Amino acid sequence: MANPDTPAAPYSVNQIVHRSNIRLERDMEICVKHEVPIYVTSLGAREEIYNAAQSYGGICLHDIINNDFAKKAISKGADGLVAVAAGAGGHAGSTSPFALIQEIREWFDGPLLLSGSI
């Protein structure tokens, strides 16, 4: 029988960090209170969001659609990247997944996930 007090596996939350997200501050308070282990952020690289999550060991992966956004996210403190390449749903990029990964790996050796055209 499952024990509800024992975590089954790491989980993550998606946080849209664009300034138009009026729930972000409250959602982050709840996530930090419960020490969410992994965040996937999108639509803006915000240092204060990364700092809040990392204050207890949380990991932040940021959705990016090109190399410029990747560099911005890492410079603001993201731990890793989700490369949303051509063929992905939602706010997809226009670059081939193989080209995008290669561009990013030229300067970044941290966690890198790929989304789209797989």
Over which residues does each language-model region extend?
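Active-site entrance/lid segments in N-terminal catalytic domains of soluble metabolic enzymes
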Residues: M1-L113
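A short glycine-centered flexible hinge/capping loop motif at secondary-structure junctions
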Residues: S115-I118
